[in-house]
Each structure stands twice: as C-alpha cells, then as structure tokens.
Amino acid sequence: MQIADDEFRQLVERVDIDGHISVWGTYGVTTVRYLNRHAPILSNFRLGDVLPLLDSAAGRIFLTYLSERTTRPILKAEASKSEESKPSAKETAAITQFVRREGYAWIDGQLFHSIRAIAVPIFDSQGELQATISLVSNQASLVQFPNPVLDDLKATGKKISHRLGWSS
C-alpha cells in the first residue's frame, strides 16, 4: 500500500484534482485513502466509505476484474436498496468490456449529480486486482476524452502495478 500511496500523492499533486484509493473489503469497494486538493467536493465522503459497483468508477473496475461470484451479492444488495433502475445485464457487460478494452472506468453524475470520476486498476505480481486509484472532480473536462489527466492516471496505475510485480 505504501508504494501506491506515494505514487498516488504525487499524481494528485501533479494534476491538482481530488483522488482516492479503494480496495475490496467485506462490504465491497472500500475507500482507504482520500486526498483533497481543494475544498472537498464531497463533504460527507469519508475513509471507509463503501462505494457502489455500478455507480462509481472504482466500483466498475472491481466489477470488471473480480469474479461474478464475488460481486453478485453486492450487486443484489445495491439493487434492493435503490429505487432507480439499474443497467441491464447487456448494459453491465458493455461497461465491463469497455473497462477491459480501455484500461479505465469513468462516471458522470451516476453517484452524485455533477460529480465525475475516472479510475484505473492496480494489479499485483499475479495479475490480481488489489486496488484502484481514482480522480474525482465536478469539472466536466475530467470525462472529456482523451485528456492528459486520464493519461497520467493510467500511467500512474501501470507504474504502481509494475512496482508490485505485475507485467502487462
């Protein structure tokens, strides 16, 4: 985690955007580090918060790379708590295919109105997903692709993964 934390701090300073590191915990995608560059975008966002699988960029990374057996109970619990319609199986498959193909996930207002986020995976030496790093902003430019912030985030994710022994 120290390797990820050091690189993450440098990234957040370089791009001057809030960010967080998340891992898979007992209840799903759990935030273990959050750095604010400005006034907090999400004033009620706390360490230990559990993020949704479909409505957060970090969640979409975990949904893509963890087994269905692992994620299914969390998806069911999320669906039972929400009155909003969730993506169909086909739409969910399109999300995970995008993440695998492009190497990142993004959201634009799904979790909170006007909040945008992009996230990338962190893999270990065996190619297993260990964490995600995400950048969060209320600026629309964060999710206008391609953009240099996304390029930096992807490069940082790969650098952390390589330092953990992953080889692409």
Predicted features along the sequence, with ranges:
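Amphipathic alpha-helical effector-binding/dimerization core
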Residues: 1-77
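Short loop/turn motifs at secondary-structure junctions and domain boundaries
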Residues: 13-14, 109-115
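Short loop/turn microsegments at loop-to-beta-strand junctions
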Residues: 19, 50, 95, 117-119
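Short hydrophobic/aromatic beta-strand element in the GNAT-like acyltransferase core
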Residues: 31, 107, 119
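Juxtadomain coupling helices with adjacent low-complexity linkers
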Residues: 90-97, 102, 113-115, 130-168
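Sensor-regulatory modules in signal-transduction proteins
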Residues: 122-125
